[in-house]
C-alpha cells in the first residue's frame, strides 16, 4: 500500500500541472522544425532556382525525420526518461539549423531537414506520452493542452521567421534558430527529471481486458486502422499548412499575408485542441475524431470556392478551428483502447503515420501545382483524402463493440 501511494502521489498534482506547462513551452520551441519550411519555401526556391515541388522536398524529409524520430525518441524516453530525448532533440535542432544555414545547394539543405525533423520529434510525441502518465480523470484535456505546444509554436514562429528572413536573409535566420534551440531549453530540463508514475498491475489488467472489448478489433488490427486514418487526414491537412504562404504569393497578396494566415490558422488550432480535449472527455476520442475530420473537410471545400484576401483570412481561421483537434484524438483513442504499457509505442506508430501523411501531402500538393499551374486541384486532392478519414472514423464509431474508456 505504501508503495502504491508513493507511485501515484504525483498524478494530477500541482507538480503534474507544472510539468504540463513546461512540456508546452518545450513543444513550442521544438516545433520550429515543422513550421520553418512553409515560410522559407519561396526564398529557397528563388535562390536555388528549382520548381515548387522540389522546393517542398525539405518539408517532406523533415516530416520523415519527425516520423521515424518520434518512434525512436519514444523508446528512448521509455528506457531513460523524458530528459534524454529532449536533450538529444534540441542538439539535433541546433546542428540541423546551423548546417542548413551553410547549405550550398537544395540537396544538402533538404538532407539536413531529416536531422531537424528528428530533433523536433522529441518535443511532441514523447512529451504527450509522458504527460498522459501524470493524469487520469483529466487526461483528455491534459493531452490536448500539451499538444497545443506544437500549434503555439506554429502561431509564433512564422511571423518571427518572416521578419528575420526579410531583414537578414534565410541563411542567417537558420543559424540564429539553431543557436536559440541549443540554449533556450536548458532551464526547463530540471522540471522533467522526475520519472512519470507507473501504473499498478490491477490497472494494467483492466486495460488489457478493455482492449479485447474495444471496437471488436485485435490490437494490431486497430493499430493498422488508426494509422490509415492518420495518414489520410494529414495528407489533407498538409495542403493549406505547407502551401498557404506560397499560395498567397501566387495570388499577388504577398508572402507576408500568407505567413499571417498560417499563424492565424495555427493560433485557432490551439483553441480547437483545447476544446477537443473537453469534448473527448465527454463523448470519447472516436466521436471527436469524426466531428473534427468532417469540419476539416468543410474548410477545405471553402478554399475551393473562395480566393479573395479577406475570404482566405476567414477560411484559414476556420481551418485552424476545425482541424486542430484531430491529431490529439489519436492519442486519446490510444489511451482509451490500448493498455498503458503499450501506449508509447502505439502512439508513436500512429503519429508516424500522421507525419507520413503531412510529408506526402506537402510534396503531392507541390507536384500537383507544378502539373496544373494552380492549387485548385491540390485542394480537391486534399478533400478526397479527408473523406477517407471521415469514412474510417464513422465506421469505427458504428462498430458494435465500441466503448468509451476512462482510466
Language model features: what each stretch is:
Residues 122-135, 325-338:
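Intracellular juxtamembrane helix-capping segments at the cytosolic ends
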Residues 18-52, 73, 157-158, 239-245:
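Extracytoplasmic
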Residues 68-106, 280:
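Conserved MFS/SLC helix-loop-helix module at the cytosolic interface between two early adjacent transmembrane helices
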Residues 37-41, 221-278:
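Extracytoplasmic gate region of multi-pass secondary transporters
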Amino acid at each position: 500500500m505504501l508503495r502504491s501511494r508513493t507511485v501515484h502521489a504525483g498524478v494530477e498534482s500541482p507538480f503534474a500541472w507544472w510539468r504540463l506547462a513546461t512540456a508546452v513551452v518545450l513543444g513550442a520551441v521544438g516545433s520550429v522544425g515543422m513550421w520553418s519550411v512553409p515560410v522559407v519555401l519561396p526564398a529557397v526556391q528563388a535562390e536555388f532556382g528549382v520548381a515548387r515541388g522540389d522546393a517542398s522536398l525539405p518539408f517532406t524529409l523533415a516530416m520523415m525525420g519527425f516520423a521515424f524520430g518520434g518512434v525512436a525518441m519514444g523508446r528512448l524516453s521509455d528506457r531513460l526518461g523524458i530528459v534524454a530525448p529532449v536533450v538529444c532533440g534540441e542538439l539535433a535542432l541546433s546542428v540541423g539549423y546551423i548546417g542548413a544555414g551553410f547549405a550550398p545547394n537544395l540537396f544538402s539543405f533538404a538532407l539536413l531537414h531529416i536531422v531537424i525533423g528528428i530533433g523536433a520529434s522529441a518535443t511532441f510525441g514523447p512529451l504527450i506520452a509522458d504527460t498522459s502518465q501524470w493524469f487520469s480523470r483529466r487526461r483528455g484535456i491534459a493531452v490536448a493542452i500539451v499538444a497545443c505546444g506544437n500549434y503555439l509554436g506554429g502561431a509564433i514562429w512564422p511571423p518571427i521567421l518572416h521578419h528575420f528572413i526579410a531583414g537578414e536573409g534565410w541563411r542567417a535566420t537558420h543559424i540564429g534558430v539553431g543557436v536559440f534551440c541549443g540554449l533556450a531549453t536548458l532551464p526547463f530540463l530540471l522540471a522533467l527529471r522526475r520519472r512519470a508514475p507507473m501504473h499498478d498491475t490491477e490497472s494494467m489488467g483492466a486495460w488489457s481486458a478493455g482492449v479485447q472489448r474495444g471496437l471488436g478489433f485485435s490490437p494490431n488490427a486497430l493499430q493498422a486502422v488508426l494509422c490509415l486514418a492518420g495518414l489520410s487526414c494529414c495528407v489533407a491537412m498538409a495542403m493549406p499548412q505547407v502551401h498557404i504562404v506560397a499560395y498567397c504569393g501566387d495570388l499577388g497578396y504577398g508572402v507576408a499575408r500568407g505567413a499571417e494566415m498560417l499563424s492565424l490558422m495555427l493560433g485557432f488550432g490551439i483553441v480547437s485542441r483545447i476544446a477537443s480535449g473537453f469534448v473527448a472527455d465527454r463523448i470519447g476520442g472516436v466521436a471527436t475524431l469524426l466531428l473534427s475530420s468532417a469540419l476539416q473537410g468543410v474548410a477545405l471545400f471553402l478554399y475551393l470556392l473562395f480566393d479573395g484576401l479577406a475570404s482566405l483570412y476567414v477560411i484559414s481561421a476556420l481551418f485552424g478551428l476545425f482541424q486542430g483537434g484531430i491529431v490529439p484524438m489519436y492519442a486519446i483513442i490510444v489511451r482509451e483502447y490500448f493498455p498503458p504499457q503499450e501506449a508509447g509505442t502505439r502512439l508513436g506508430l500512429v503519429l508516424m503515420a500522421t507525419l507520413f501523411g503531412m510529408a506526402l501531402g506537402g510534396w503531392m500538393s507541390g507536384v500537383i501545382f507544378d502539373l496544373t499551374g494552380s492549387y485548385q486541384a491540390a485542394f480537391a486532392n486534399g478533400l478526397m483524402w479527408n473523406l477517407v478519414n471521415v469514412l474510417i472514423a464513422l465506421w469505427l464509431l458504428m462498430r458494435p463493440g465500441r466503448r468509451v474508456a476512462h482510466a
